[in-house]
């Protein structure tokens, strides 16, 4: 049989008719296996994550050799991992060291240097003072920032000798045989732009505080739970109380939240290191100070800014107005922790009154401050620990750290604070050790 074209038909030329596959059949044959594989992979990932969460919660993994130890063995002072990594990322005691040989005075932030030859302090003359010397002075105090300095006139009541200085990248030194200060001026030095807030507080009495009034306040949290307050000193460092960390020594479980007056309403920042002052066995309530180093530096903004450290000669007389802030309990017994940052205006209480028989009976030492109100009612409670006691001159300074007290807001037992001026050298040395 031939085709119309005259060519014989060949069975091989005939294309068999195939019934098109319906979409439903294609899905059953191809889609379902793919989905099954994806779901299996997702299930495996979820199971792996759950296993990791459980392991991380109860166990620590030692690297070499691979072993598991219980979380309770972390930071217990014993090397349970062969290579000792279970004791590496722990809260560290930082001992007292020799004092830093530079300081700033409340007299116009003038720079003073310790004369190693005589053991006395001298104000620094502006003659031949350079930006390099300014950076060296600031680095001695633990500041790694661009300093600002200017000349200020020597006043007639200047009570320290005036000296020219020299130095290297490590420290300033009094220049031997330096001439008189020809410029008639001292060095006024600022190592960091600090202590500025966008709003001035106007209300008192434990009321809600806007975040831009206190942009240096942070929440320090352990396993996502607020434990203590703290104060931003610079992009890397947070100042707080040592007792916040006595029970929880694993640094990796601590986080810092900054930039919000609502508890838990800002991203958490990982912590690199925590240093606490070595405790004094004779006075266990002393040395309640700690520094937290962040893994990444803060970016300053209207709601994230540093507070100033006090000047070395800053003295607060009784009745000086100061401020306290925090997310503490609103009542002494049975109250709940505030979700909003609270502020209160208080005043410095005379240490003699604070140590009276109806108060703290001599427990308050020279390294502490008392603050409250004579009638009581405005104070700090649990949860405010580590937060700042603040004083305003031309800028805000953190003069105290919330430390301890009996009750909350009692008229005879005001709050007790770590006196920051007593620990300036400790702060300088800790920061300098990490530069």
Swiss-Prot record:
It is a single-pass type II membrane protein. It comes from the Eukaryota. Proteolytically processed; probably by an autocatalytic mechanism. Its main location: membrane. Disulfide bonds join 62-81, 75-90, 125-181, 138-191, 194-308, 228-244, 354-370, 381-408. The record marks 202-203 as: Cleavage. SUPFAM superfamilies: LDL receptor-like module, SRCR-like, Trypsin-like serine proteases. This is Transmembrane protease serine 4. GO terms for biological process: negative regulation of growth rate; positive regulation of viral entry into host cell; protein processing; proteolysis; regulation of gene expression; response to wounding. Plasma membrane-anchored serine protease that directly induces processing of pro-uPA/PLAU into the active form through proteolytic activity. Seems to be capable of activating ENaC. Glycans are attached at residues 128, 176. It comes from Mus musculus (Mouse). InterPro entries: LDL_receptor-like_sf, LDrepeatLR_classA_rpt, Peptidase_S1_PA, Peptidase_S1_PA_chymotrypsin, Peptidase_S1A, SRCR, SRCR-like_dom_sf, Trypsin_dom. The active site is at 243 (charge relay system), 288 (charge relay system), 385 (charge relay system). The chain crosses the membrane at residues 31-51. GO terms for molecular function: serine-type endopeptidase activity; serine-type peptidase activity. Its EC number is 3.4.21.-. It is found in: Cell membrane. Belongs to the peptidase S1 family. Residues 59-101 form the LDL-receptor class A domain. Keywords: Cell membrane, Disulfide bond, Glycoprotein, Hydrolase, Membrane, Protease, Secreted, Serine protease, Signal-anchor, Transmembrane, Transmembrane helix. Residues 1-30 are cytoplasmic. Residues 52-435 are extracellular. Residues 102-202 form the SRCR domain.
């Amino acid at each position: 049989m031939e085709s119309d074209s005259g060519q014989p038909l060949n069975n091989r030329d005939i294309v068999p008719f195939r019934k098109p596959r319906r979409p439903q059949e294609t899905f059953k044959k191809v889609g379902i296996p793919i989905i099954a594989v994806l779901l299996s992979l997702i299930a495996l990932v979820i199971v792996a994550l759950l296993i990791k969460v459980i392991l991380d919660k109860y166990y620590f993994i030692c690297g070499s050799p691979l072993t598991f130890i219980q979380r309770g063995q972390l930071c217990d002072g014993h090397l349970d991992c062969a290579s000792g990594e279970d004791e590496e990322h722990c809260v560290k005691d930082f001992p007292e060291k020799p004092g830093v040989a530079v300081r700033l005075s409340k007299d116009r932030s003038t720079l003073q240097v310790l004369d190693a030859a005589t053991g006395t302090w001298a104000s620094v003359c502006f003659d031949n003072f350079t930006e390099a010397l300014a950076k060296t002075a600031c680095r001695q105090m633990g500041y790694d920032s661009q300093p600002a300095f200017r000349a200020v006139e020597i006043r007639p009541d200047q009570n320290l000798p005036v000296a020219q200085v020299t130095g290297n990248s490590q420290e300033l030194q009094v220049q031997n045989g330096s001439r008189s200060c020809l410029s008639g001026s001292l060095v006024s030095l600022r190592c960091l732009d600090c202590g500025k807030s966008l709003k001035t507080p106007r209300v008192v009495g434990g009321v809600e505080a806007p975040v831009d009034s206190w942009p240096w306040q942070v929440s320090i949290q352990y396993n996502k739970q607020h434990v203590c307050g703290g104060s931003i000193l610079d992009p890397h460092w947070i100042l707080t109380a040592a007792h916040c960390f006595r029970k929880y020594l694993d640094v990796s479980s601590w986080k810092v939240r900054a930039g919000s007056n609502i508890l838990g309403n800002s991203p958490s920042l990982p912590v690199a290191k925590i240093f606490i002052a070595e405790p004094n066995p004779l006075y266990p309530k002393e040395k309640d100070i700690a520094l937290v180093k962040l893994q990444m530096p803060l970016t300053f903004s209207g709601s994230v800014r540093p507070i100033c450290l006090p000047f070395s000669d800053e003295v607060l007389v009784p009745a000086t107005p100061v401020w306290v802030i925090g997310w503490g309990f609103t009542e002494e017994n049975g109250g709940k922790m505030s979700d909003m940052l609270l502020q209160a205006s208080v005043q410095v209480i005379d240490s003699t009154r604070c140590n009276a028989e109806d108060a703290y009976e001599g427990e308050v030492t020279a390294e502490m401050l008392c603050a409250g109100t004579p009638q009581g009612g405005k104070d700090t409670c649990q949860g405010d620990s580590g937060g700042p006691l603040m004083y305003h001159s031309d800028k805000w300074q953190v003069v105290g750290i919330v430390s301890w007290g009996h009750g909350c807001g009692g008229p005879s037992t005001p709050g007790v604070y770590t006196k920051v001026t007593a620990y300036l050298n400790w702060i300088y040395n800790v920061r300098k050790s990490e530069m």
